[in-house]
Amino acid sequence: MKQLEAFRRKALGFPDEAPLAGQYDLVVVGAGIAGMSAAVSAARLGCKVALINDRPVIGGNNSSEIRVHLGGRIEEGVYKELGGLQKEFGPEKGGNAQPAENYEDQKKLDWLANEKNVTLFLNYRAIGVTKDGNKITSVTARHIESGKEQKFEAPLFSDCTGDGTIGYLAGADFRMGREAKSEFGESIAPEKADKMTMGASVQWYSVDNGRSSSFPDFSYGVEFNDKNCEKVLMGEWTWETGMNLDQIKDFERIRDYGMLVVYSNWSYLKNQMKENTQYRNRKLGWVAYVAGKRESRRLMG
């Protein structure tokens, strides 16, 4: 791997050391809802903030790539200000697996652009950290398209990656999966610890085409019949898979299988099911190409 890395750097004309993107008071890695909120909260307190995100849009699961609704209890009890930031950038419409415009990606980007103390780095994925003793001093991130790298220095870092990536790269203890019942006394925990997690959802929806439409009819590798097929017009978070696989190492495999199930089920509804009148004029309007992850590493410190 090191030889390949050196070859790639030389072929692309990249320097041996990633250039410094800047020095910041806080570097936030991951621009989902948590990362956006952390970055702007710090910026409004006077911090110079770098916000790094490995996708071309921000919002994480609430972006148009994944399309999970933004919701939760806010402004309740003694926590009257809890949720105030999210109200500033959150989309007006709710719901899962809705048209892309419902998730208002541009509204989120515009909201961040108005914060003069936040610099957003889109399409950069964190790949390494440097430490001084037990303290992280910099994060290196690589552009997912060009391969160019940049280094970000700061006294403070916020891991909002969802996978605990920065903590993991820094050598922090973490857990993944379920603890044994004996550890915390949870009544429904397994007798023995295992690696099972919540899965990842590949959401989708169909639209009325106004006329009969076709869909490729061949064996997708997942067999459906009238008893086990899902007779639905859309799929939300319940179209979840990968519970017994590694949500990091196997994530593309999990996503691919989720898509396979969507296409296999839709093919059955369109081509094999006898009573399929409600599907004849419908076509797939959208299928997520980025799965919505529900669980990953839990950093222990």
Could you say what each language-model-derived stretch is?
Residues 27, 55, 161:
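Anionic group-transfer/hydrolysis microenvironments
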Residues 1-7, 15-16, 21-23, 41, ...:
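Conserved N-terminal/central alpha/beta ligand/cofactor-binding core
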Residues 29-33:
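Glycine-rich Rossmann-fold phosphate-binding loop(s) that bind the pyrophosphate
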Residues 128, 140-141:
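A compositional/structural signature marking long, glycine- and acidic/polar-rich segments
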Residues 27, 75-76, 92-98, 153, ...:
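Second-shell loop/turn segments in exported
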